[in-house]
């Protein structure tokens, strides 16, 4: 990325007018944002870095500062004849976010079309204050490989499904790149994003994505990185770091749809992927099948429980962990220390819990740390840390 782009300030009308403050650092140049994040990371990990070892921190990886996000979570507001897709603003007003700069142009256009779809279907937006209405959220996910979409309508009940089905053929004829459509039923009168019941309105139930020639699949409830450009670099870096150890066996804990493990896999490596979300495991299994991988096992289990149930004799050469923001926790840290693999690759979306976990992983030292700016304009970022056995 050129210096001019990195040092430019993004102009966002929503932020300037005080309507949406989610991108709290959008008025800072990207280079400045990344410098602050780098400093934060270095301070948090300072206790684990030997003196005169600043070279452990590799240069941060950045991507575009707009049009990078592949997922939109839109609250549906307003009325059936005049719906608004966006957020509730700071003053309680409905803010239309269809032109949010984080979304690619084709995604912005589709969001505008979905506003008209809601109007044509006559779907009344759910009113939290009155506990009335039907349509709560519209969730839209984009695959960068073909510009295809997964579209979800979150409803209070089954009452709105018929209206969606009535208008859907015209929408799909206009936007054939919408490959998956589903309705999620969320009956609870609370600000919860989704419920347990998912009803597919298309034959397709998953969206294909591809990073570094690795096929990955997205289903409605499976977690997937929201910045494909930087996520692809994150997975590629993990692949290169793991290859340095030539492992014959590998665990991928909190594996999600298998992004890390599948990037590192080959038929010479025995790969075990563990993830509690069954939908994500189904996606990972499909990817492994497409890649022709034979020594691969993906299981829908709790990662901590899985590790506790294993003996030292089962230990792999290398373990990858990619936990949610809470980190891996003391119990799993203890299990990793006892298994004593050659190396542990830790991918973290919360450097505070990474630092906390590092206190409890015994017998290892950091050899590489790299920041990946998956979330421009926010305080958040991803970190890849390589721990090697003492």
From Swiss-Prot:
Pfam families: tRNA_U5-meth_tr. One of its GO terms (biological process) is rRNA base methylation. InterPro entries: 23SrRNA_MeTrfase_RlmC (IPR011825), MeTrfase_TrmA_AS (IPR030390), MeTrfase_TrmA_CS (IPR030391), SAM-dependent_MTases_sf (IPR029063), U5_MeTrfase_fam (IPR010280). It catalyses: uridine(747) in 23S rRNA + S-adenosyl-L-methionine = 5-methyluridine(747) in 23S rRNA + S-adenosyl-L-homocysteine + H(+). It comes from the Bacteria. SUPFAM superfamilies: S-adenosyl-L-methionine-dependent methyltransferases (SSF53335). Keywords: 4Fe-4S, Iron, Iron-sulfur, Metal-binding, Methyltransferase, rRNA processing, S-adenosyl-L-methionine, Transferase. [4Fe-4S] cluster binds at residues 12, 20, 23, 100. Its EC number is 2.1.1.189. The active site is at residue 349. Belongs to the class I-like SAM-binding methyltransferase superfamily. RNA M5U methyltransferase family. RlmC subfamily. Catalyzes the formation of 5-methyl-uridine at position 747 (m5U747) in 23S rRNA. This is 23S rRNA (uracil(747)-C(5))-methyltransferase RlmC. It comes from Shewanella baltica (strain OS155 / ATCC BAA-1091). The gene is rlmC.
């Amino acid at each position: 990325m050129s210096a001019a782009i990195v040092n430019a300030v993004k102009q966002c009308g929503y932020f300037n007018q005080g309507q949406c403050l989610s991108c709290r650092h959008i008025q800072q140049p990207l280079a400045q944002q990344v410098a602050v994040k780098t400093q934060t990371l270095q301070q948090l990990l300072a206790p684990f870095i030997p003196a005169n070892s600043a070279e452990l921190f590799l240069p941060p990886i950045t991507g575009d500062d707009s049009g990078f996000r592949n997922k939109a979570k839109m609250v549906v507001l307003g009325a059936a004849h005049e719906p608004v897709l966006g957020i509730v603003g700071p003053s309680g007003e409905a803010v239309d976010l269809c032109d949010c700069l984080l979304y690619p142009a084709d995604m912005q256009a589709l969001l505008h079309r979905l506003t008209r779809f809601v109007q044509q279907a006559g779907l009344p937006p759910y009113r939290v204050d009155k506990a009335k209405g039907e349509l709560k959220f519209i969730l839209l996910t984009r695959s960068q490989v073909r510009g295809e979409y997964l579209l979800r309508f979150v409803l209070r009940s089954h009452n709105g499904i018929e209206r969606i089905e009535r208008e859907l053929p015209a929408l799909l004829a206009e936007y054939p790149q919408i490959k998956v459509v589903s309705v999620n039923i969320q009956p609870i009168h609370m600000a919860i994003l989704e419920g347990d019941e998912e009803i597919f309105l298309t034959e397709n139930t998953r969206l294909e994505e591809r990073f570094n020639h690795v096929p990955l699949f997205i289903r409605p409830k499976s977690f997937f990185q929201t910045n494909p450009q930087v996520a692809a670099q994150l997975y590629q870096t993990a692949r290169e770091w793991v290859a340095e150890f030539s492992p014959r066996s590998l665990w991928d804990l909190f594996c999600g749809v298998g992004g890390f493990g599948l990037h590192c896999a080959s038929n010479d490596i025995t790969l075990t992927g563990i993830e509690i979300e069954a939908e994500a495991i189904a996606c990972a299994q499909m990817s492994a099948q497409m890649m022709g991988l034979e020594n691969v096992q993906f299981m829908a289990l709790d990662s901590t429980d899985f590790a506790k149930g294993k003996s030292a004799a089962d230990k792999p050469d290398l373990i990858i962990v990619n936990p949610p923001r809470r980190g891996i926790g003391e119990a799993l840290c203890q299990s990793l220390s006892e298994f004593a693999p050659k190396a542990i690759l830790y991918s973290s979306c919360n450097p505070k819990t990474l630092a906390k976990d590092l206190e409890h992983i015994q017998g290892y030292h950091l050899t590489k740390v790299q920041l990946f700016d998956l979330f421009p304009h926010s305080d958040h970022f991803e970190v890849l840390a390589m721990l090697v056995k003492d």
